[in-house]
């Protein structure tokens, strides 16, 4: 029996549909460059009430030098405001204030984002941190769930960070809860690390008997043709396929990986926020922001426990 759409606490279903219609046609994925709508200063980005937008973004060498460039910080902040939660990779800084300072920049328009950040990781002197930045109006973090996946055999250069989240735009008894597992693989050890991540994914599936939604997301340094290890997991699927995710538009490195039917909340909508197209940047300026584009997927904000929902119409928001 098909799952029924659970009514959401919005002014009206037509209002949510009207918002999606308004957002249709904005620059997303690798669509041809077009004109994204200008957001008025000081007004937080409007997000759809019938979807939560989960993104991943490798902000290349995200540290003091990047935070010292106001124009880069402005673009990064505008990127984050499009999404309900963003998994960040490659925080690389001596200072502990990089992510807090950045979140203050995100919130400069009146938004209410918060963050969780992991420890510095890596086998060499060049350590990296993972972080999750999320809109507290729409997402709640279970801070007791935040941790790093154990890797006693040292198979992963930077073991992934995990945290559990819950949507806040539906009554708590209906809310979609899910694990996010943030990963940046070593480009020199991709096959071995993808094999190890298969075990990580299955361990996260078993971590809590009351939680079957696991979304592994990040910079995998690999695309779907190289996902043979993941295919050992029953029902495995991914959000991004057939498009490039790096800023030069040559490779597919970044993705969101989950299983169906477990994560029935996935709405069949995903994409790549192309920095050049969305913000009108020439390649050299886009590369100052990152050598990766953000990737995203849309999920229904209430738990769905039967057959998957039909794909949603319209496109997701992108702010210039």
Please place each PLM-identified region on the residue numbering.
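Divalent cation-coordinating acidic motifs and surrounding scaffolds
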Residues: 34-320
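Low-complexity, intrinsically disordered short peptide segments enriched in small/polar/basic residues
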Residues: 3, 7, 24-25, 49
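Bacterial N-terminal signal peptides
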Residues: 18-31
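N-terminal regions of proteins, emphasizing targeting and processing segments when present
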Residues: 10, 14, 31-32, 299
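Hydrophobic alpha-helical segments, especially transmembrane helices
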Residues: 12-14, 21, 194
């Amino acid at each position: 029996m098909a799952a029924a759409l659970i009514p959401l606490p919005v002014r009206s279903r037509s209002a949510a549909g009207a918002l999606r219609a308004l957002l249709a046609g904005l620059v997303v994925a690798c669509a041809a460059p077009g004109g994204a709508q200008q957001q008025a200063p000081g007004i937080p980005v409007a997000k759809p009430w019938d979807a939560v937008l989960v993104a991943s973004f490798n902000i290349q060498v995200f540290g003091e030098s990047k935070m010292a460039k106001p124009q880069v910080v402005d673009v990064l902040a505008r990127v984050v405001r499009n999404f309900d939660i963003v998994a960040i990779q490659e925080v690389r800084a001596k200072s502990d204030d990089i992510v807090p300072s950045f979140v203050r920049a995100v919130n400069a328009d009146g938004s209410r984002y918060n963050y969780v950040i992991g420890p510095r990781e890596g086998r060499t002197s060049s350590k990296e941190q993972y972080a999750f930045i999320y809109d507290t109006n729409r997402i709640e973090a279970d801070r007791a769930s935040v941790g790093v996946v154990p890797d006693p055999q040292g198979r992963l250069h930077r073991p992934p960070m995990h945290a559990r989240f819950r949507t806040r735009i539906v009554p708590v008894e209906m809310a979609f809860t899910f694990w996010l597992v943030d990963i940046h693989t070593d480009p020199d050890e991709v096959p071995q690390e993808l094999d190890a991540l298969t075990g990580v994914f299955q361990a996260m599936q078993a971590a809590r008997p009351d939680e079957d939604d696991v979304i592994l997301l990040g910079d995998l340094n690999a695309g779907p043709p190289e996902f043979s290890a993941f295919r050992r997991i029953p029902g495995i699927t991914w959000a991004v396929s057939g498009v490039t995710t790096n800023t030069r538009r040559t490779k597919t490195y970044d993705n969101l990986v989950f299983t169906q039917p477990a994560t029935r909340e996935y709405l069949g909508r995903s994409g790549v926020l192309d920095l050049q197209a969305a913000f009108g940047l020439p390649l050299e300026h886009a590369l100052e922001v990152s050598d990766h584009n953000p990737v995203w997927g849309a999920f229904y904000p209430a738990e769905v426990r039967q057959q998957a929902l039909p794909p949603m119409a319209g496109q997701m928001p992108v702010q210039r």
